[in-house]
């Protein structure tokens, strides 16, 4: 029976638990696995195994994250839970855990707290499209009016950060009660998961988006022409397709793909996630290089100025030991390219301390193919000092 869980015949979504420290995110994660395990849809995970999260590296940044997987009747979920607040900030800004939706956990005993607010803001900034709320620890609150007040506060906070505060479902329950097998609270976990199934929408899969591939390497095959290799980020490519080649300050080039190869075999097409070589008609090796991108015509354009949300590493994380000021000039690693840029601080901010998570304006030395939502690393002297995401393109 247990083997059944890994069949991939259901739509797959990435979700996570977010919210203030000690409001019960990890307990909720454990109780979801326990309740679903009773139906043969998950392997029950102990609180301690989720809380003791392994370290991962993403864009040179170490993050502690627990990945749990489970199913409902209609979907397969990968669920991310982080032990520490800083891990959430890093996880969301670096995109180590892309979330299609999240469960916001708020303890009824406290109501929304500073990190509740910060996680909602982060979710909004990094584009988590849908949230569902689990109001936890309601078994510790005797007064119905308090629960109503907490709900109003949560809804106001969600609306403030441009989520649909009026309509987002709020499920009341006790994660610990469910974990301890109390029927009443187990039922609320089932209600929560039905709500997640219905309210968190399926994302547009990468394969259904327009074609885009960052170039990693370029070489010539005698008698056949120039080949660009890379991993397809989105979409599909077929022999005979027209494409744009963009980036690094030059005018865009147009070409036609005359062959798609993978592991030295000719394919009829390549799709998101594949590492391929594309044979390009009429393109010289000297015309293109690593760091450019190949895309569906007109899909992506080069830009040099944008607003970004960035996280700056602490000294203990291998980052800078000192703050930086306005017009700081590090290297930006965008897809397969690195380019120098200037960071302009906003809102009269004078300096940025290691460990800060802030909004800034970036101006690159030369235009690069970027789009809103793109993640990047910030490096200086060969080491990663931060990570960020393009929030809005200016020019």
Swiss-Prot record:
Q: Lineage of the source organism?
A: Bacteria, Pseudomonadati, Bacteroidota, Flavobacteriia, Flavobacteriales
Superkingdom of source: Bacteria
Function per UniProt: GTP hydrolase that promotes the GTP-dependent binding of aminoacyl-tRNA to the A-site of ribosomes during protein biosynthesis.
Q: Does the keyword Protein biosynthesis apply?
A: yes
Identify the residues that the record assigns to the tr-type G domain, covering every copy. Answer: 10-204
Q: Of which family is this protein a member?
A: Belongs to the TRAFAC class translation factor GTPase superfamily. Classic translation factor GTPase family. EF-Tu/EF-1A subfamily.
Could you tell me which HAMAP family the record lists for this protein? EF_Tu_B
Instruction: From the UniProt record, list the reaction(s) this protein catalyses.
Output: GTP + H2O = GDP + phosphate + H(+)
Q: Note the PANTHER family from the entry.
A: ELONGATION FACTOR TU, MITOCHONDRIAL, ELONGATION FACTOR TU-RELATED
- The molecule here is called Elongation factor Tu
> Known InterPro entries for this protein?
EF-Tu_GTP-bd, EF-Tu_GTPase, EFTu-like_2, EFTU_2, G_TR_CS, P-loop_NTPase, Small_GTP-bd, T_Tr_GTP-bd_dom
Q: Name one GO cellular component term.
A: cytosol
Segments of this protein annotated with the region G3: 81-84
Where it sits in the cell: the answer is: Cytoplasm
Extract the CDD domains matched here.
EF_Tu (cd01884), EFTU_II (cd03697), EFTU_III (cd03707)
Q: What is its main location?
A: cytoplasm
List ligand-binding residues for Mg(2+).
26
**Which GO molecular function terms does the record list?**
GTP binding; GTPase activity; translation elongation factor activity
Where does the chain bind GTP? 19-26, 81-85, 136-139
Q: Where is this region: G4?
A: 136-139
Subunit relationships: Monomer.
- Region: G5; residue ranges are 174-176
Q: What class of enzyme is it?
A: hydrolase
**Keyword terms of this UniProt record:** Cytoplasm, Elongation factor, GTP-binding, Hydrolase, Magnesium, Metal-binding, Nucleotide-binding, Protein biosynthesis
Question: Gene for this protein?
Answer: tuf
Q: Per the record, which residues fall in region G2? A: 60-64
Give the residue ranges for region: G1.
Answer: 19-26
């Amino acid at each position: 029976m247990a083997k059944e869980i890994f069949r991939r015949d259901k739509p797959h979504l990435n979700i996570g638990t977010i919210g203030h420290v000690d409001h019960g995110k990890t307990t909720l994660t454990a109780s979801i696995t326990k309740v679903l395990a009773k139906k043969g849809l998950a392997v029950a995970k102990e609180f301690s195994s989720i809380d003791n999260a392994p370290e991962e590296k993403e864009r040179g940044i170490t993050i502690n994250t627990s990945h749990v997987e489970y199913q409902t009747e209609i979907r397969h979920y990968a669920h991310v839970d982080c032990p520490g607040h800083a891990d959430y900030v890093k996880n969301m800004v670096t995109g180590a855990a892309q979330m299609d939706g999240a469960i916001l956990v708020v303890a009824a005993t406290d109501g929304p707290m500073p990190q509740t607010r910060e996680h909602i803001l982060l979710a909004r900034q990094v584009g988590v499209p849908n949230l569902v709320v689990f109001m936890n620890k309601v078994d510790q609150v005797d007064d119905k009016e308090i629960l109503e007040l907490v709900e109003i506060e949560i809804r106001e906070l969600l609306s403030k950060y441009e989520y649909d505060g009026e309509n987002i479902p709020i499920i009341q329950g006790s994660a610990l009660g469910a974990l301890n097998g109390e029927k009443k609270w187990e039922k609320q976990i089932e209600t929560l998961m039905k709500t997640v199934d219905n309210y968190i929408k399926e994302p547009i899969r990468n394969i259904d988006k327009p074609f885009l591939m960052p170039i990693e390497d370029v070489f010539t095959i005698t008698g056949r022409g120039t080949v660009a290799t890379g991993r397809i980020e989105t979409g599909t490519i077929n022999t005979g397709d027209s494409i744009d080649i963009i980036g690094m300050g030059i005018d865009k080039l147009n070409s036609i793909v005359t062959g798609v190869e993978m592991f030295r075999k000719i394919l009829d097409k390549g799709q998101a996630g594949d590492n391929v070589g594309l044979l390009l008609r009429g393109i010289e090796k000297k015309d293109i290089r690593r760091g450019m991108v190949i895309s569906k015509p007109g899909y992506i354009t080069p830009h040099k100025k944008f607003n970004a949300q960035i996280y700056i590493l602490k000294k203990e994380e291998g980052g800078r030991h000192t703050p930086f000021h306005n017009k700081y000039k590090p290297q930006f690693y965008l897809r397969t390219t690195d380019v120098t840029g200037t960071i302009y601080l906003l809102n009269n901010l004078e300096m940025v301390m290691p460990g800060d998570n802030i909004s800034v304006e970036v101006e690159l030395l030369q235009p690069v193919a970027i789009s809103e939502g793109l993640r990047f690393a910030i490096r200086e002297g060969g080491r990663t000092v931060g990570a960020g995401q393009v929030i809005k393109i200016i020019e």
